[in-house]
Amino acid sequence: MEEIDKSISFDGRDIRLKVGLFAPQAGGAVMIESGDTAVLVTATTAKGREGIDFLPLLVDYEERLYAGGKIPGGFLRREGRPPEKVTLTSRLIDRPLRPLFPSWLRDDIQIVATTLSMDEEVPPDVLAVTGSSVAVLLAKLPFYGPMAAVRVGLVGDDFIINPTYREVKNGDLDLVVAGSPQGVIMVEAGANQLPEQDIIEAIDFGYEAVCDLIQAQREIIAEMGIELVELEPPEVDPTLENYIKEKATEQIKEILSQYDLDKNQRDEKLDEIKDSLAESITELPEEEAVRAMVESESMLLGNAFKSVTKKLMRQQIVAEGIRVDGRKLDEVRPVSCRVGVLPSRVHGSSLFNRGLTQVMSAVTLGTPGDAQELADDLHPQDEKRYLHHYNFPPFSVGETKPLRQPGRREIGHGALAERALIPVIPKSDIFPYVIRVVSEVLSSNGSTSMGSVCASTLGLMDAGVPIVKPVSGAAMGLIKEDEEVRILTDIQGIEDFLGDMDFKVAGTDSGITALQMDMKITGLPIEVIADAIHQAKPARIHILDKMLSVLDLPRPDMSPYAPRLLSFKIDPEMIGLVIGPGGKTIKGITEETGVKIDIDDDGTVTIAAADGEKAKQACNIIQGMTKKLNPGDVYVGRVTRIIPIGAFVEVFAGKEGMVHISQIADYRVGKVEDELAIGDEVIVKVREIDSKGRVNLTRLNIHPDEAAAARANAMNY
C-alpha cells in the first residue's frame, strides 16, 4: 500500500495522518499524531452472524504504559484492568461512529485504537476518534462519513482547538465536538457555569475545525483512489409491515393517544396488540406470504411492529405536537424530591423522582487520604476529591439479570453526572473532605443520568457540603421527519428509543456545567443544536425550583457520624519532625488520640476523628511540636533527663531545651537531683537559642502573670 503522510495545523499545533505503513493485515489502519502523542487506529470487518438485528460494532481503546515511558506495577508487570479513562474513551469513539454506519449493516466491525506514544501536552482521545473514521474509510466499509473530532478549550476570552492538559485544567471549558459532512453528530463537555451562547459559539467554532479534518480525510482517500462506499440498502419485503398497518394502525394510535397510561401500562397494551397479530397470522393459510415470513424468522414480527409503532409515534409528535403521555413538546414530567431518606449513618441522602424515573443518591464524607489515586495512568491528573458512581440494577426496568461489575454505560453515566457537579464542589481549603456520591437508579424511564445530577445535588446539600450553587439537568430529544424538526424537553424512555437525539444538559441558574449529545442520524446543523440548548434552560430552572423547595441551602451541620476534620498548615521542613523516625511520632499521636492524620507535601495537615475534641487534641500536639520557640516565651514543661550540669525539659512533644544548674533556682544548687526529678512539671522561660539551634531555658525571672498564661495554654495541649 502506498504510504501517505498528511498534516493539518490548528493554532500552531499539527495533526498528522500516516497511512500505508502500519498493520498491513487490518482492513484499514492509520497512525494519527500530534506532538509526541501517537495513536494507531485499525478497522477490521468479518461476515455478519445469522439472526442478529443490530450492528455488531465493537470499539476498544487501549493505552500502553510504555507510551509514557512507564513500567506497569504488580507482580506480572503487565497492563492490568483498564482505568476508567480508557472505558470513557472507547465510548467517545463509538458514539459518533455508530450513527454513520447504515442501519441495515450486520457485518461484525471492530475498531481498535492503541496509544503508542504520549506526551504530557496532547490528549489522545480526540485523535483516536478522528483516526477511527480514517480506518473505516480505508477498510472500504459502507459509511456516511468522513467523521472527525476536536477538543475546544477556552483560554481567557478565546476559544482554541485541541488545548493541552494544562490549558484545559486552567480554563473554563473542556468540549469535544464530532461531526460529519451533514453536521454535528456528538458533543461532550464540561464547563464552569458558562452561558448558553458561549457553549453554542464553542460548538460552532469546533465544527469549523472538524470540517478541515474531514477535508484532509477526503484528500487521503482520493490520493489512494478510494471512493466512499455508499451501498443501497437491501430490499425489504413490505408485506408484513403492510399487514400490521392494515390490521393494527388504529389500535396503536389509540394506545399512543391514551395519555393517562404509564410506561408499563402502555407497553402491556402494545404487547397485547402484537400478540393478537401473531395469533391472527397463525390462522392464515399456510401459503400466505405473511405467515411464511413470520414462521421463517421469529424476530420479523417484533421488528416490524416496532417499526410501525415508531412511525406512528413520530407522526403524532410532528403533526399534533403532543407526546405519548400527553405532554407538550417543552413540558417537563412531574418532579418530586426528598432529602434525608436514609438514617444519619449515611452522611447525606436524597430521592429524586421525575415521572417514572427515580434515583436515590447517598453521600459519604471521607478524609484526604481517601482521595482516588490514579495509578498506572498516562494522563496527568491530580487526585480526585469528588467521586460519583452510578448503579443501574435490572429491577429498575422490571427485568431479571445477573448482577455484574459496572459496564461501559454505567461508567459513562457516572462520569457525566460527576462532571456536572465538579464546578460547584468547594475547594479543599474551604471543605477538606473527600466526597463520594453513589446514585442508585431505582426506576428508569429515561434520563437517569440527569436524575443522578439532581439527586446528587440534593444529597450533597443534605450532607452539609457547601456547594457553590445547586445543579440540575434535563435530557432533550429530537424527532426529524424530512424537513420537519421537533425538539422534545425531558424525554422518557420510548422517546429516547424511537427518537433521533439524546441531548443531556446540566447546569446552575448561572450557566452550563456539562453537556452530552448523541445522535441516531448523520448530523445536525448548529442552529438546531442551539435551539435545543436554549430550550433546555427553562426546563433546568423549573426542575431546580422544585429541588430548592425541598432544601434551598446546604445544611449547616453534618451528620454526627461524619468524620470531623481539622486542617492547618505547618512549615514543610517540620514534616519529618511530626512523622518521626520510622513514623514513630505520628503513630504515637494517633494511638494517643485515636485520630487519623494526613500530611501533604506542602505542609497541610488534616486530622480526622469521630470526636471533635480528640481532633483538637491532636491538632494542639502537632501545632505545639512545630511551633518555633522564641526567647522570652514561657511554657509548662516536663523534665525528661538529668545530667550533672542541668536538666532537659520537654516543652512540646519532640521539642526540648536544657535548664543549666545555675538557672534552676535563685540560690546555689549543689545537685540537680536536689531540685528536680524526671517527670516533674516545671515552668520555664526560653533564655536563648544558640547558633546551633540548641534551646537554653531558665526558671528565673518569670512573672506570675507569665506563669498563669503558660498554665492556661498548657491546658489546651
UniProtKB/Swiss-Prot annotation:
Its EC number is 2.7.7.8. Pfam families: KH_1, PNPase, RNase_PH, RNase_PH_C, S1. It is found in: Cytoplasm. InterPro entries: ExoRNase_PH_dom1, ExoRNase_PH_dom2, ExoRNase_PH_dom2_sf, KH_dom, KH_dom_type_1, KH_dom_type_1_sf, NA-bd_OB-fold, PNPase. One of its GO terms (biological process) is mRNA catabolic process. Keywords: Cytoplasm, Magnesium, Metal-binding, Nucleotidyltransferase, RNA-binding, Transferase. GO terms for cellular component: cytosol. Mg(2+) binds at D496, D502. SMART domains: KH, S1. It catalyses: RNA(n+1) + phosphate = RNA(n) + a ribonucleoside 5'-diphosphate. Residues 632-700 form the S1 motif domain. Its main location: cytoplasm. Its cofactor is Mg(2+). Residues 563-622 form the KH domain. One of its GO terms (molecular function) is polyribonucleotide nucleotidyltransferase activity. NCBIfam families: polynuc_phos, PRK11824.1. Belongs to the polyribonucleotide nucleotidyltransferase family. Involved in mRNA degradation. Catalyzes the phosphorolysis of single-stranded polyribonucleotides processively in the 3'- to 5'-direction. This is Polyribonucleotide nucleotidyltransferase. It comes from Trichodesmium erythraeum (strain IMS101). The gene is pnp.
